[in-house]
């Protein structure tokens, strides 16, 4: 598996981790969730990312999750494994373990958080991870969560590494445009911002690594199809209706809102693990009205005037 496997993936879902009320992983809930995603235009699946609440998962739990999902997916779509932390040595050891585990198109490695490395420190961190195994690496650049930002210039240095095949970019559309304009041909650029997917695809991005595709994959697929067919009027009309849903899904720390919607839809997404908590009941009801029912009046009570948490 390689760049070519992922090149065809426009909608990659950053999969939640379903939990029981006691906080243990609900493995019995995973098959229905996976089939739902595949039935609604998910082209690839990211495991043990931020939406999976990876900071609260042990490596052993992540490996159990990997095995369970691989068995269910059975090669139908490419899988990406979250492999990075803010500890370079730990990241190297885990990426080696995941590479030996097998079955993944790539590993996703986040920009180191909390310890605030320099650009050179970040470059050396990702180079060391990419050098450690033959598992292709996608970099996750999300300064809203990690405080520091990998600049486009540093990203392009890393893009020359033969084992670094892409980026999940959550900075600005200006940075994304620069990367798309100057990147090597076989380097994937995904947006990690659902609300920016329309703009990113029009700039030439390869796709989106998405939370909203858990609940609104059909709309995203329809919008991307319209863009591919140069029907901008249709694509923009879908985007206008999609944005309030995205805002609702991120009106409370993620993945609490999407889990609330999935639970309402009949899937056993369960609660979040501390320190995240479920959305309050009244907020959850409003989120569901927007995301499921398209009740945009509920948007005003849910998201208007609320500073959306970074995800």
Curated annotation (Swiss-Prot):
It is an enzyme of class 4 (lyase). Keywords: Amino-acid biosynthesis, Cytoplasm, Diaminopimelate biosynthesis, Lyase, Lysine biosynthesis, Schiff base. Pyruvate binds at residues 51, 209. It catalyses: L-aspartate 4-semialdehyde + pyruvate = (2S,4S)-4-hydroxy-2,3,4,5-tetrahydrodipicolinate + H2O + H(+). GO terms for biological process: diaminopimelate biosynthetic process; lysine biosynthetic process via diaminopimelate. The active site is at 140 (proton donor/acceptor), 168 (schiff-base intermediate with substrate). Gene3D superfamilies: Aldolase class I. HAMAP family: DapA (MF_00418). This is 4-hydroxy-tetrahydrodipicolinate synthase. It comes from Streptococcus pneumoniae (strain CGSP14). The lineage of its organism: Bacteria, Bacillati, Bacillota, Bacilli, Lactobacillales. The gene is dapA.
